Amino acid sequence: LPEVIKMLKNVPVDVCNAATRLHCTCGYQISVGLKTKNIPPYLWWYIYDEDIIPARVYSPSLKSPDNAPEGCSSLQMEVYCNRDEYTQEELLARSVGKLVSLNILKEEDILFTDIRFESYANVIFDHNIYEARKIVRDYLSSVGIETIGRFGEWGYLWSDQSLMSGLKVEM
């Protein structure tokens, strides 16, 4: 929503101010391709350790066997931080490297790693969100812009909920 407001001209000051009060996390997604199916049997799992920087680990290959080649698996780790807070070497050492040191992964099973920065990860639900979100969305609606999805509704929507959000506008 803040990005949409920045694109428009002649937006009322109160709407611009409300948009600046909407916040979200950003961070890195670290993907690991593995030549084994021997991974933790959890679709999502959370890590509460300051030395291991991913907050959450997800296994796309557990979600669907079509998400990895036969005999292989995959993990994706979410690290919430600012861009350039860590070097790529630090990201790998404090995520994949930690899982190896804990015997969760074996170094020899790693086929590849991939690191990507996501500017918009999760909406932050702070004290300002409800009032600020309403001001911004009401204004956009008043000028004929309907917003959809996680960052259009500025809420914690999963992929299917984001899709339904768009379909509701179409109907």
Regions found by a protein language model. Name each.
Residues 1-90, 94-102, 135, 139:
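Mid-domain catalytic core of redox enzymes
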